[in-house]
Amino acid sequence: MPSSLLVRSFIAVSFFSFCFAVAAQPPGPGRGSGQGSADRGDRGDRGQGRFGEAMPLRTAGLEKRPGLLDTWFDRKTGKVWLVLPPVDKTGVVGSYLYEEGILTGVGSNPVGLDRGQIGDARVVTLRRVGGRLLLEEPNLRFRALSQDAAELTAVRESFATSVLWAGEIVETEPKGHEAVDFTSFLVRDAHNVTARLKQAGQGNWSFDPGRSAVDFANSLSFPENLEFESVLTYQSQEPGELIRQTAPSAEAVTLVQHQSFLRLPDIGKDGYHPRAFDPRAGSFPVEFLNYAAPLGEPIETKWISRHRLEKVDPKAERSRVKNPLVYYIDPGAPEPVRSALMEGVSWWKEAFDKAGFIDAFRVELLPPGASPMDARFNVVQWVHRSTRGWSYGGGITDPRTGEMLQGHVTLGSLRIRQDRLIFEGLAGADKTGSGAPDDPIQISLSRIRQLAAHEVGHSLGLSHNFAASTYGRASVMDYPAPQVDITPQGDLDFSHAYAKGLGAWDLFAIKWAYTEFPPGTDEKAALDAMLRDAIAHGLIFLTDQDARPPGAANPKAVLWDNGSDPVESLRHEMEVRRIGLAHFGEHNIAPGQPLALLQEVLVPLYLHHRYQLDAALKVVGGLDYSYALRGDGQPPAKPVDGDRQRAALTAVLDTMTPAALDLPDPVIALLLPRPAEYRPNIEMFHNQTNPAFDPLGAAAAAADLAVDGLLQPERAARLVDFHRRDAKLPGLEEVLAALVDRSFGGQAQETARQAELRRVVQWVVVRRLIGLADDRDASSGVRARVEGTLRALRGRLAPAAPGAHTADPTDPLDPETEQHAFLAAEITHALEHTDRDPAKHPLPPAAPPGQPIGEAPMFLPEGLSGCSWGD
């Protein structure tokens, strides 16, 4: 997600008195061409300039590159010299926007160091202190929006700053220009790669300056920005497994680091105007504490993140803009993906047009040789990893105001292949490449269009809206599940799998964030009126905090779901799953492929219902709420109706019956052991029958999705509290009783085949009940009720315990009796053991990962959304 950087001014002047100009340069054509030009950026000449005349011995043979700050490049020594203009009376050279990132990546999704990854944008000030130049980051988390110098000084002196680097000033010429060796700033671990590798469990790493250098050929100078690249090497004696899988020599990881300095944009009367954040509108904020706020107002201040769009005619309802937004697509994306990306990104043109901006948004290919790290480009990068991974959108944001200066999007290339795998499981690989509505490639291209639009939406300042799927397909900022219909003949219909274009929420969110009102308009009142109208038309907004936690409460906020009725939608997806499994066979992989690969294709089909299951789970102990503001007329929070909760509970329990979990023998017969050099991977079910496929392990993983979801401690606590306040709502006791009865009842009507599946479910239920009883984060009321359920269940199973039978003790017990004896012993051990540590409890096998099929990485640098928050 975009960073929540907080802001204050560094020197004792009003916040709005920062002096800067718009950083808007036409894109340059070349990267690595070795030729300087006005557009390209100056690569320098070897002649003598003003500084060279003052210091002929130091600059002889060096390349001078004029720009935002003049630089001299010494190819012989590998050094970069920064030439500074005269300082002011406080010693300040100037303030700039600083951005760092990595041009090249490690290529491992769990590690998280991806090609084109950027970090936070920071305001930095260059100032002279004695004989040293300090590069200092002001503490922009705290500030005073005031014209009073004393007020500003009080805030400035109350909080620490951060000096990021210091260098010796080696010589001062008579005119006041100074030089400093800037090499050590450029050749350092600015992206904190060593810490990130350690955090990812890849061992201890150190930066090796002896194998690192500034890349002169790809360091550019422009009037509004400086771009520096350095080749950096990191070393380790014990590299982790993920590095061994991706680096050619695991003990050395070499990356290209990119650092940018930008002229600060103008703000205030003739520049960018921040817009106040509203939690109902779906924009990302920057946040700060304003110590000059009146006593009757909060000091917490939030402004939205957005690009600057200025109308040529500010008074016109519709007008062209001074500087249109141009997004450049990575030409490294192959066709037909490239065209799909361009089409999906171009959908945003409609939103800006409806917000009153004519031709304000367009999409082009990145010019040949141009660097995607150049801060002048809004870019959509196509990034490869060794395994499928996240996509995310963000960019360079001015932390003082929220103005977005560059949109930067990363799209994982294996995402579309995972989509194709999903649809080959549903439709069959024989349809691949046919061009028909059920062609997995065509369906996947439809999804990649939405993914591109989604991530660019983040880079325009928009958050996820996970409620949009409940009122139509209303937003690309949701995570869209494919809509698979069922024909009257019982076949699967993919013709409406994904929507095309933006939804109603997207159009509103851009209009609210970007509309420029005519002079004299009460902006606050106008924006509030827009929100009231949107709410009246059913456009609600719920985001990550409401959707992602396993114990989340609002059934409207769900990832990868469809429809306004979670229960009915779950039943539909279970029927889609049943039809898909009934037709599953050799045709689900391409001719000539090993049949063993059907195991990977089976996983997303067998777990097809997993996200709609999450939607139904949120109905149980669910709470309907919105981001209401006082006076906006939205209703207060209310628990979900009891009948709806009970219907959802029934639908959830239906997903873990033996009939739902069983796989047909013809399918199991095709799931062959792995051939030579086809190693098991995380896309397969956990296996306890190796080398044979483990259908009982798959059943345990699928059942656990439901059981673990029901027994989340937050959901259990809500059930206790909601029932306390309204006896018509189901309580935790009712849910626990239903779970136990459905798991331990019905054996008389089952075949031996089905009974074994039920015993798998019983073990999952007992393990999860024990885990919740010992969960120290669960409330005492929850733990007491769960422990009571376990004691009652042990009593129910007790007749099967050893010693309860009068038959010959050498006679084997039947499987049901053995199971009950085993589970009773498990419960006894758990309840009576003195060290009730949940971490020591064995858990059911985890299902293979559903995500990443979107954004949300395990690790994301500040400044990116992600989309662990998503695509």
Ranges and model annotations:
Residues 26-333, 351, 360, 365-418, ...:
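Auxiliary tRNA-acceptor-end handling modules of aminoacyl-tRNA synthetases
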Residues 346-357, 385, 457-458, 482, ...:
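Sec-exported extracytoplasmic/periplasmic mature domains
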Residues 403-407, 452, 457-460, 510:
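Extended catalytic-interface subdomain
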Residues 9-21:
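Bacterial N-terminal signal peptides
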Residues 1-11:
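Bacterial N-terminal signal peptides that target proteins for export
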Residues 471-871:
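Conserved catalytic/binding loops enriched for acidic/polar residues
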Residues 339-346, 350, 446, 450, ...:
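Solvent-exposed, polar/charged alpha-helical surfaces in well-ordered, non-transmembrane soluble domains
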Residues 30, 51, 365-384, 446-502:
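The catalytic-center signature of Zn2+-dependent metalloproteases
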